């Protein structure tokens, strides 16, 4: 590309036309489909792409202004070079005989002029390369803007009709999922519940053929959700509740909601932990009288006793062989919840900060179902940022260096545990409270 073949005025004119073609698209609630905030993104919307288009256009306009400035500098430098060449041509007369006393002076002047010409030629070449690069960037950005506008048009066409929610939320409501099942609900899925002294919120209820209604508050499936969250996020909950019985999303219901459910009834709740390894083997661990206190007590976890389950009682701690006090300092009963920005554990440091994830920490843990998701299960000290076991672990079933493939944490009133599912053999200590037959749940 030569400078003479692309006059600056022409390039400026082209750039001006291209810049004026970037029209801003302002997204409002009138021209976007606004979905109910309770659900995930189940309907197409133009708002996100429109916002991105506006931001992207601002960046392109800035690049254009920079390009115009560079072109202006190049034009000035080129004009200076042309004037210099013209002056050389005028001063040079081949017919005039050289005077001996002027030879040295003329030689110096010629050398200086040649150096100036070479300098300007180098500068022009550099600016031409910059112009070519910026032109390529501009062309690429222009094409991206065109593509985004096409997508906006497509989405606007799709949203001419009111968006239809594809999420099925059942009409039955109750204090928890067992109350929902008692009122006739027979299908697992999304339900609104309203615990005592609380506003209603959405939960996933797992309802079996025996009428047992489990309220699910944690799900790990595939590592698609990052559990490295702060205190507020763990309090409010994060992730998406699955609208289908397959349970195909990961989520944490929220510490405040878990507290409201687990402390509302005179009948205690059972916590069931379900685990699956990377070979498809499953196991469970059940805990009686599970509760989570309020935020003023840092959402402290408590339970009465371990009922049973082939996963073992990791909440009671585990002797890793590192120290004689391992089991005591890795137990979880009575521990407050900790996150990287709210240290409430028994360790001098911050266990949650070491692993980056919220949990009921001691010094630190024998079971951690919110841990880092490791594909394939096995990991080692060298694969962690600081050498600590930070996977999805349950030390009484698998090694601390084995991360589970799937986990579920769910609760149900204690008087339902022995009904169906062949759970009678797991009651163990539950017989101490005299639960031998079906009793409908009662609330204070």
Curated annotation (Swiss-Prot):
Residues 168-415 form the Fibrinogen C-terminal domain. The keyword Metal-binding applies. Disulfide bonds join 177-205, 351-364. Residues 1-24 form the signal peptide. It comes from the Eukaryota. PROSITE patterns: FIBRINOGEN_C_1, FIBRINOGEN_C_2. One of its GO terms (cellular component) is fibrinogen complex. Glycans are attached at residue 76. Conversion of fibrinogen to fibrin is triggered by thrombin, which cleaves fibrinopeptides A and B from alpha and beta chains, and thus exposes the N-terminal polymerization sites responsible for the formation of the soft clot. The soft clot is converted into the hard clot by factor XIIIA which catalyzes the epsilon-(gamma-glutamyl)lysine cross-linking between gamma chains (stronger) and between alpha chains (weaker) of different monomers. The keyword Secreted applies. GO terms for biological process: cell-matrix adhesion; platelet aggregation; protein polymerization. Keywords: Blood coagulation, Calcium, Coiled coil, Disulfide bond, Glycoprotein, Hemostasis, Metal-binding, Secreted, Signal. SUPFAM superfamilies: Fibrinogen C-terminal domain-like, Fibrinogen coiled-coil and central regions. Its main location: secreted. Residues 25-165 form a coiled coil. It is found in: Secreted. GO terms for molecular function: metal ion binding; signaling receptor binding. Ca(2+) binds at residues 343, 345, 347, 349. Pfam families: Fib_alpha, Fibrinogen_C. A long coiled coil structure formed by 3 polypeptide chains connects the central nodule to the C-terminal domains (distal nodules). The long C-terminal ends of the alpha chains fold back, contributing a fourth strand to the coiled coil structure. PANTHER family: FIBRINOGEN ALPHA CHAIN. Heterohexamer; disulfide linked. Contains 2 sets of 3 non-identical chains (alpha, beta and gamma). The 2 heterotrimers are in head to head conformation with the N-termini in a small central domain. Together with fibrinogen alpha (FGA) and fibrinogen beta (FGB), polymerizes to form an insoluble fibrin matrix. Has a major function in hemostasis as one of the primary components of blood clots. In addition, functions during the early stages of wound repair to stabilize the lesion and guide cell migration during re-epithelialization. Was originally thought to be essential for platelet aggregation, based on in vitro studies using anticoagulated blood. However, subsequent studies have shown that it is not absolutely required for thrombus formation in vivo. This is Fibrinogen gamma-B chain.
């Amino acid at each position: 590309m030569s400078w003479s073949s692309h006059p600056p005025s022409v390039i400026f004119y082209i750039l001006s036309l291209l810049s004026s073609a970037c029209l801003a698209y302002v997204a409002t609630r009138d021209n976007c489909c606004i979905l109910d905030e309770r659900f995930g993104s189940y309907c197409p919307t133009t708002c996100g792409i429109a916002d991105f288009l506006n931001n992207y256009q601002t960046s392109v306009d800035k690049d254009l202004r920079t390009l115009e400035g560079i072109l202006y500098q190049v034009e000035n430098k080129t004009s200076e070079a042309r004037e210099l060449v013209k002056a050389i041509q005028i001063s040079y007369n081949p017919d005039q005989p050289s005077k001996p006393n002027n030879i040295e002076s003329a030689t110096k002047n010629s050398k200086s002029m040649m150096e100036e010409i070479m300098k300007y030629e180098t500068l022009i070449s550099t600016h031409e390369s910059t112009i070519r690069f910026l032109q390529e960037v501009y062309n690429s950005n222009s094409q991206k803007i065109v593509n985004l506008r096409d997508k906006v048009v497509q989405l606007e066409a799709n949203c001419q009709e009111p968006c239809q929610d594809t999420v099925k939320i059942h009409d039955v409501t109750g204090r928890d999922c067992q109350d929902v099942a008692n009122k006739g609900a027979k299908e697992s899925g999304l339900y609104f519940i309203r615990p005592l002294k609380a506003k209603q919120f959405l939960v996933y209820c797992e309802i079996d053929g025996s009428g047992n209604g489990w309220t699910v508050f944690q799900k790990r499936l595939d590592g698609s959700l990052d559990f490295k969250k702060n205190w507020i996020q763990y309090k409010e909950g994060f992730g998406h509740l699955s609208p289908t019985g397959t349970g195909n999303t990961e989520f944490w219901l929220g510490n405040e909601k878990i507290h409201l459910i687990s402390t509302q009834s005179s009948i205690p709740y059972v916590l069931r932990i379900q685990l699956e390894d990377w070979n498809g083997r499953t196991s469970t661990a059940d805990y009686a009288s599970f509760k989570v206190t309020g935020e003023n007590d840092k959402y402290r976890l408590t339970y009465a006793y371990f009922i049973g389950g082939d996963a073992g009682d990791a909440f009671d701690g585990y002797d890793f062989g590192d120290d004689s006090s391992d089991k005591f300092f890795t137990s979880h009963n009575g521990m407050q919840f900790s996150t990287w920005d709210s240290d409430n554990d028994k360790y001098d440091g911050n266990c949650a900060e070491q692993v980056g994830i919220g949990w009921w920490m001691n010094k630190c843990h024998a079971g951690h179902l919110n841990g880092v998701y490791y594909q394939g299960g096995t990991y080692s000290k060298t694969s962690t940022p600081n050498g600590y076991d930070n996977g999805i672990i349950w030390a009484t079933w698998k090694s601390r260096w084995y991360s589970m493939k799937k986990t579920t944490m769910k609760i149900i009133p204690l008087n339902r545990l022995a009904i169906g599912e062949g759970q009678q053999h797991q009651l163990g200590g539950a017989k101490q409270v005299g639960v031998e037959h079906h009793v409908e749940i009662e609330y204070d």
